[in-house]
Amino acid sequence: MAASAFLLIASFLLVLMALAKPLGSLLARLINGEALPGVGGVERALWAVLGIRQEEMDWKRYLLAILLFNTLGLVLLFAILMCQGVLPLNPQNLPGLSWHLALNTAVSFVANTNWQSYAGESTVSYFSQMAGLAVQNFLSAATGIAVAFALIRAFARQSATTLGNAWQDLTRVTLWVLMPISLIIALFFIQQGAIQNFSAYQPFTTLEGARQMLPMGPVASQEAIKMLGTNGGGFFNANSSHPFENPTALTNVVQMLAIFLIPAALCFAFGDAVGDARQGRAILWTMTVIFVVCVALVMWAETTGNPHFLTLGADSAANMEGKESRFGILASSLFAVVTTAASCGAVNAMHDTFTALGGMIPMWLMQIGEVVFGGVGSGLYGMLLFVLLGVFIAGLMIGRTPEYLGKKIDVREMKMTALAILVTPALVLLGTALAMMTDAGRAGMFNPGIHGFSEVLYAVSSAANNNGSAFGGLSANTPFWNLLLAFCMWFGRFLVIIPVMAIAGSLAAKKAQPASPGTLPTHGALFIGLLTGTVLLVGALTFIPALALGPVAEHLSLVK
């Protein structure tokens, strides 16, 4: 089992890095504003048709464009979901969503969270899936990448007042990165057996003679961007454990690679854009080290399983509950860590059925801000916040003004960094407390004990950190839960983006100073250790008390 786990992790990472390096070079060209071969004329025509001026924006205009773009997307998606009963491509005649579910869903997909308080096959029409949810899968991913582009330019430029053009970044990322790769992945999924049609649901008779319905729909096209854009919202309620979404072991691997592809590529792009590839590799190494340790822990917890199984006559204590037999424990464990390390949230197994420790690791990966690869764009700018915090701590220890890539980190940057890092923990802890203190919050809990608290903590952690996965065991389609989670999703997304853009504007205006003998190298093993320690320390100090009340207590009750 250990050898199989090692081979699975090693082969996954090798293929990932081989794919991410060339994509990183493409992203670096987009960051630098270089014209891509063969598309320059297309872009110029597009700017003219759309009325996009090619002048660059300062950080305030860039931020305003991002906020306006996403707010308009929220309004449009909310309207589509409310009115889907009278819109086309609705062969099952599904009615419009309730106002609070429509609001929750619209916020969820615009904020790149894809939390779902509904079952897709019984709630959302084909038109809503394609024109609403799938479109936002592209646009929310492009938003995260655009913000990352702006922050990377801030480190790469000197004495600059602008960070690029938001409209051009959103358009170029969508047209030349997200759409082509999604098309390739979608065609591969169709070849492997994922469905892509507009048929009405198909009736069939089971072996027991019961009549049931097979849901249909344009699944493969949405599945591709769902994974590539670290969105995660499933076409069906079973998400990537459904054979129509994830039909084979090969598609399972491709889905995991798609989740990490752009976050890993952005690390390479960062190194290329700032003129020092070692800087990007240091961040990538930090992410990889934490990721490998977390995967190993989950695999160990799930293969060790529940010792009480043996006393009840089971052949093995290994925990196969809630997992697809065609994927098994190792692939399910790897998928769980990949989807929660990134802000994806897609699942090929039910996280609620993992062991206490096996479920705690995915929860903790979300709680530290999903900076271990993380979401497209958001993972890199989230980790760069920890980089700034790490060099600040190092500067305090050696008595020097902290600096990164030659740029001094002043009070303004540290205030914004602290604000961005503290937003999601505050939302998680306050949201969980509110849910546990109110009758409306507790009414949604199917498990009132220790595990019930873990389910609530997981749900709010998932929403505030824009992941979207769930433990289950929670009746979330109520006004209280829909509004609470919508609040956490929206502000967990944009109250981080706002200080990140402020940091970008401040850093872009600074000149890079040449390195001196006392400058902390930010590309070696020492810095990788410092950055890893910073991430772990912040996560430990913030969430250990809450985790002790949930999964830790549950584990201790199991082994006592």
UniProtKB/Swiss-Prot annotation:
UniProt keyword annotations, A-Z: Cell inner membrane, Cell membrane, Ion transport, Membrane, Potassium, Potassium transport, Transmembrane, Transmembrane helix, Transport
GO molecular function: P-type potassium transmembrane transporter activity; potassium ion binding
Membrane topology: Multi-pass membrane protein
Subcellular location: Cell inner membrane
Residues annotated as transmembrane: 6-26, 63-83, 132-152, 175-195, 250-270, 282-302, 327-347, 356-376, 379-399, 416-436, 483-503, 524-544
Top-level taxon: Bacteria
Main localization category: membrane
Cellular component terms per the entry's GO annotation: plasma membrane
Subunit structure, as described in the record: The system is composed of three essential subunits: KdpA, KdpB and KdpC.
Family note: Belongs to the KdpA family.
Role noted for this protein: Part of the high-affinity ATP-driven potassium transport (or Kdp) system, which catalyzes the hydrolysis of ATP coupled with the electrogenic transport of potassium into the cytoplasm. This subunit binds the periplasmic potassium ions and delivers the ions to the membrane domain of KdpB through an intramembrane tunnel.
Protein name: Potassium-transporting ATPase potassium-binding subunit
